């Protein structure tokens, strides 16, 4: 074999001598690693029962050998009940389990704007993984009383009826309640769309919704430019019950982080009826004692703990706010049911959507007589509050008078004029979805109505006149702080001819 072939032959290292091996063994220092390991006893319906792990505590994260993981949800003397958050096909009885040494948290921060995620922070929009080191616990204590401030700033939803008669303030918790198909989600989506350009960051939480509904909502937000300042948290109908249960807490934690940084936020929980049903399902599977309507006894505490985190912080704590719009479904208009009454007592007011009004074509189908905002009026702009008070009185009197006309009762001429104006007002309050309106427009039409500038218009043409008025507003109008005289002067110059002529 020549020299070239010797150089090309790979060299094999010689084994270490026995003396060298002895030196290495002598240097070795054993380090004991102590850990707890358990075993899956049974698994099914999104629940895993685990034996062992004596130091496990509530809300601890469990890791399974096959890659699945769960969160501790029930503790008994012999077993641990865990709610699965990721389940592989290989998870079976006998799979080893261990404690992860942490509790549940979710990524937070600027990178979440415009993203669609699941409740544990995994992207669902096909985008790149979230690049943030900031995380926040899903379940954290609500801000203390000393850190809170009064609700003082209005949050405009863009809906005529809401911004005038049932106003909402930043930091308020306002329930949206009604039967299925009455426009509850549409009202919340309009509120999100109206935050464009208002420096309000939004979180829309979809709980137990069908995939088609989820996709439709996301596309709607994207098409109207609202996804740029919104994060969507999805626990869809086909996902594990644990993900549906955690969805509102994840959305709240994301908004809570922005609030702590001094931003105004809006959170929509769509909807908490499904969330309550999911919690009931998990509780029954974990063999917790059932209470009224088979819900566990702490269902009220669960939702109160979630919604109490929405507030307005004082300037010393950043001055941010979190406004919550929880949605709840009723059946056949029964607002006295268990979950609706719970949420009514927790929140600061409710917007009730009536199925009869919806069937009659009045949209949004808000029943003013059963809707209330307990603290929103304090945050309402003084000029809007002044005009809304006069208009609301007229509308409520009209609703009472209209009942008598159904029995064929004869009315005096003054009463007939009131009914005529009331029907005109009802037509004004109609509004198509996805058409949020600025507060200046709300003040303009209420001032015009209260002054009688619209009385000459037939109800069928008043919407066209209001559209022209809104177009004129875009070209310039007095500020909200302007006097009533200034607004009346501007209205007489910009209202369509029929109204201006009669004025």
UniProtKB/Swiss-Prot annotation:
Gene3D superfamilies: 2.40.30.20, ATP synthase alpha/beta chain, C-terminal domain, P-loop containing nucleotide triphosphate hydrolases. GO terms for molecular function: ADP binding; ATP binding; proton-transporting ATP synthase activity, rotational mechanism. This is ATP synthase subunit alpha 2. It catalyses: ATP + H2O + 4 H(+)(in) = ADP + phosphate + 5 H(+)(out). Its EC number is 7.1.2.2. Produces ATP from ADP in the presence of a proton gradient across the membrane. The alpha chain is a regulatory subunit. It is a peripheral membrane protein. Keywords: ATP synthesis, ATP-binding, Cell inner membrane, Cell membrane, CF(1), Hydrogen ion transport, Ion transport, Membrane, Nucleotide-binding, Translocase, Transport. Belongs to the ATPase alpha/beta chains family. F-type ATPases have 2 components, CF(1) - the catalytic core - and CF(0) - the membrane proton channel. CF(1) has five subunits: alpha(3), beta(3), gamma(1), delta(1), epsilon(1). CF(0) has three main subunits: a(1), b(2) and c(9-12). The alpha and beta chains form an alternating ring which encloses part of the gamma chain. CF(1) is attached to CF(0) by a central stalk formed by the gamma and epsilon chains, while a peripheral stalk is formed by the delta and b chains. It is found in: Cell inner membrane. GO terms for cellular component: plasma membrane; proton-transporting ATP synthase complex. Disulfide bonds: none annotated. The record marks 371 as: Required for activity. InterPro entries: ATP_synth_asu-like_sf, ATP_synth_asu_C, ATP_synth_asu_C_sf, ATP_synth_F1_a_nt-bd_dom, ATP_synth_F1_asu, ATPase_a/bsu_AS, ATPase_F1/V1/A1_a/bsu_N_sf, ATPase_F1/V1/A1_a/bsu_nucl-bd. It holds the Pfam family ATP-synt_ab.
């Amino acid at each position: 074999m020549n020299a070239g072939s010797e150089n090309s032959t790979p060299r094999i290292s010689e084994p270490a001598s026995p003396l060298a091996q002895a030196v290495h063994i002598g240097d070795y220092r054993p380090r004991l690693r102590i850990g707890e390991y358990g075993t899956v006893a049974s698994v099914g319906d999104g629940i895993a029962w685990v034996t062992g792990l004596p130091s496990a505590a509530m809300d601890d994260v469990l890791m399974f050998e096959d890659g699945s993981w769960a969160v501790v949800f029930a503790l008994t003397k012999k077993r641990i009940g865990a709610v699965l958050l990721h389940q592989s096909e290989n998870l079976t009885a006998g799979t080893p389990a261990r404690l992860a040494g942490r509790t549940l948290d979710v990524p937070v921060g600027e990178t979440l704007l415009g993203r669609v995620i699941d409740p544990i922070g995994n992207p669902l929009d096909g985008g790149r993984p979230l690049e943030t080191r900031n995380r926040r616990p899903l379940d954290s204590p609500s801000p203390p009383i000393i850190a809170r401030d009064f609700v003082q700033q209005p949050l405009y939803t863009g809906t005529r009826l809401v911004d005038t008669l049932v106003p909402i303030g930043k930091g308020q918790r306002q329930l949206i309640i009604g039967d299925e198909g009455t426009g509850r989600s549409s009202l919340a989506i309009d509120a999100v769309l109206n935050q464009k350009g208002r420096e309000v960051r939004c979180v829309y939480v979809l709980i137990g919704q069908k995939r088609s509904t989820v996709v439709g909502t996301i596309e709607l937000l994207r098409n109207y430019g609202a996804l740029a300042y919104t994060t969507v948290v999805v626990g869809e109908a086909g996902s594990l019950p644990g993900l549906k249960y955690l969805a509102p807490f994840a959305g709240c934690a994301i908004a809570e982080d922005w609030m702590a940084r001094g931003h105004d936020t809006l959170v929509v929980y769509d909807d908490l009826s499904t969330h309550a049903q999911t919690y009931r399902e998990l509780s029954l599977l974990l063999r917790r004692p059932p209470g009224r309507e088979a819900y566990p006894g702490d269902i009220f505490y669960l939702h109160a703990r979630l919604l109490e985190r929405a507030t307005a912080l004082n300037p010393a704590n950043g001055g941010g706010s979190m406004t919550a719009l929880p949605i709840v479904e009723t059946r056949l208009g029964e607002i006295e049911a268990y979950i609706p009454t719970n949420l009514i007592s927790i929140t600061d007011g409710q917007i009730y959507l009536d199925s009869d009004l919806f069937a009659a074509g009045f949209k949004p189908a808000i029943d003013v007589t059963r809707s209330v905002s307990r603290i929103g009026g304090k945050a309402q702009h003084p000029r809007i509050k002044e005009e809304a008070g006069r208009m609301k009185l007229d509308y409520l009197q009209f609703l009472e008078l209209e009942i008598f006309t159904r029995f064929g009762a004869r009315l005096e001429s003054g009463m007939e004029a009131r009914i005529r104006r009331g029907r005109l007002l009802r037509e004004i309050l109609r509004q198509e979805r996805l058409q949020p309106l600025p507060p200046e427009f709300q003040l303009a039409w209420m001032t015009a109505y209260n002054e009688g500038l619209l009385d000459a218009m037939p109800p069928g043409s008043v919407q066209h006149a209001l559209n022209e008025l809104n177009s004129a507003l875009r070209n310039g109008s007095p500020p909200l702080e302007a006097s009533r005289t200034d607004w009346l002067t501007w209205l007489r110059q910009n209202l369509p001819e029929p109204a201006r002529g009669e004025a």
